[in-house]
Amino acid sequence: MLQIKSIPAFDDNYIWLIQNRDRDCAVVDPGSAEPVLAYLKQHDLNLKAVLITHHHHDHIGGVAELVHQFPEIHVVGPAQEPIPTLTHPVEDGDQIELFDERFMVLGLPGHTLGHIGYVGDGKLFCGDVLFSAGCGRVFEGTMEQMFSSLNKLLSLPEETQVYSAHEYTAANVAFALAVEPENEQLHIYRDEVSRLRAQNQPTLPTTLGREKWVNPFLRTQEPSVIRSVASQVSTLDPLTIFTALREWKNEF
């Protein structure tokens, strides 16, 4: 079983560090090298690999410096995105070996066209596609692509731990409660999130099982979610409901 640690960066990013028992590690989406280097030094760890989900600067900004400091590391990332430091470009359906665990690469377009995720050892590293109680903005792809990517994640086991790249949970829960004000699970979760953030603790990882109860973007067939946007749409199919929710969240 791999250990996962969070390294905060910028205002709300998480760089996830994956560690084995031999003090070897990998990091996911290092937008800045400085906090990673400090953590490696403090905990006497050996960096072996970098995993990248997409090309946005707050996810890759530290990669060049990490490669400079550790020239032998593997840099794994989406083959379809402009990331010059990649040594191992991957795409949907590929597999990678990481510290004797096998991770599957999932194509998750929507936020960006080539966005990918990594799932293995009961853990999902999904970048800016799925957040707790929310989902990423659709920048390069289409609403249909993002909706399809989220549905792909729903097929994973409910106990899968979800490691998103940002601490957006409190704001997402506020929106989710606007969508479903009578969702008792959301009220319970809001209190838990408030307690964790008051202690400066991360709200992640979450689980897919929990997200099915609290994330409106995964609940587009629930009557309470449909009612929240029904007056804004002409049809009530799940993609239309998702699109209306995402557009609402953009302005929330």
UniProtKB/Swiss-Prot annotation:
Q: In which pathway does it act?
A: Secondary metabolite metabolism; methylglyoxal degradation; (R)-lactate from methylglyoxal: step 2/2
The keyword Metal-binding is assigned to this record = yes
Tell me which residues bind Zn(2+) 1.
Answer: 54, 56, 111, 128
Presence of the UniProt keyword Chloroplast in the record: no
Name its co-factor(s). Answer: Zn(2+)
Q: Which InterPro entries match?
A: Clx_II_MBL (IPR035680), Glyoxalase_II_hydrolase (IPR050110), HAGH_C (IPR032282), Hydroxyacylglutathione_Hdrlase (IPR017782), Metallo-B-lactamas (IPR001279), RibonucZ/Hydroxyglut_hydro (IPR036866)
Q: Where are the transmembrane segments?
A: none
EC number(s) per UniProt? 3.1.2.6
> What does the entry's cofactor note say about binding and number?
Binds 2 Zn(2+) ions per subunit.
GO biological process assignments: methylglyoxal catabolic process to D-lactate via S-lactoyl-glutathione
What reaction does this catalyse?
an S-(2-hydroxyacyl)glutathione + H2O = a 2-hydroxy carboxylate + glutathione + H(+)
In terms of HAMAP family, this protein maps to: Glyoxalase_2
User: Could you tell me what this protein does?
Assistant: Thiolesterase that catalyzes the hydrolysis of S-D-lactoyl-glutathione to form glutathione and D-lactic acid.
**What is the protein name stated in its UniProt record?**
Hydroxyacylglutathione hydrolase
Tell me the organism. Vibrio cholerae serotype O1 (strain ATCC 39315 / El Tor Inaba N16961)
Lineage start: Bacteria, Pseudomonadati, Pseudomonadota, Gammaproteobacteria, Vibrionales
Gene name in the database record? gloB
